[in-house]
Amino acid sequence: MFRVCIVILCIVLILYIHPPVTEPMSMRSTDFNQHLNDHGYYIDTDAMSIYDKHDTLIKHYPTLSFNSNESSRIAINKPLTNTILLDHNIPTPTHDIITTQNKNTFKHAKSYFPCVLKPVDGQQGKDVYTHIDSQRQFDLILNQMFKTHDAIMLENLVEGNNYRIFIFNDTILDVIERETPYVIGNGTSTLQELIRHKNNELVSNKRYPVKTMDLSCLQRQGYTLSSIVSPNEKVFITNTINYHNGANPKRIPVHTVDRDNKDMFLKAHRLLGLECSGIDYMSPDITLPYYKNKGHIIEINSKPDTEIHMKAENRPNVFFQTLIQTF
């Protein structure tokens, strides 16, 4: 029974002091304001506008977060966003919504396996469970999620690399690959010791530790927390590939992204009426067109965090310098 639980439960095991979370992209963002000022621009938050040093209006936005309330409402509604994308032939996972009212009569889970469960109103990858491939695992995770959420989104699992595409002023500014957290064995340390050491390093470098670790992820690779990992052996330690869960940000040059992919990202951005967005995209290779390697848009965020772009390669100025060039 203990072994079964190890396979099917995704358990939060490691607790560390969390680095401070930066503000989402908005006119009140300290970093954004500082870089604008450095380049001769300033923001009038009352007018929700950006001006140059000669007081010439550069651009007016509907809200301080750049996006209209309506477009933000659509983007926050994950099922609605998915439906809009599918209606316009943009690849995104098929989905169902499970609520406290229909959970006992919902009988279609098997048709989605392997699947993903995530809260309809979630953010930053919190409470997202992937690689669910059995009814028992599905039921246990679903019941756990209903303790804190009223509606759960069920999706087909999409495999591949995890990318964040940042769009502002109708321009793709930055593309980041979020690399899955892993450890490298040394032949003497247990997997749990290696994970603890990795998290200590992440925190000392002012990065987010791996807080959510999936034991089922370890089991699929043939490991437990007490396993001694062979020298130079790589072990992935979580299915939650998110910057706030220890993922490493790797900048992908925008010019290397396939043109059809870029057109698709901009189309999705415009369909929701957004001025600023962060698109989450899964694909084996973003330099190849989505229709050749089953690339899918997983989510569109109307208030994207800029921290991942600033931390990539420890070059925070690159992102904002590119952003300012859009004015």
Regions found by a protein language model. Give the residues of each.
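C-terminal active-site "lid" helix and adjoining low-complexity regulatory extension at the edge
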Residues: 243, 249-256, 270-276, 283-327
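Hydrophobic faces of well-ordered beta-strands that scaffold small-molecule active sites
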Residues: 117, 152, 277-279, 298
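Active-site nucleotide/adenylate-binding loops and adjacent lid/helix of ATP-dependent enzymes
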Residues: 51-212, 258-262
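A long amphipathic alpha-helix within ATP-dependent nucleotide-binding catalytic cores
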Residues: 196-287
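Generic non-transmembrane alpha-helical segments
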Residues: 35, 39, 84, 88, ...
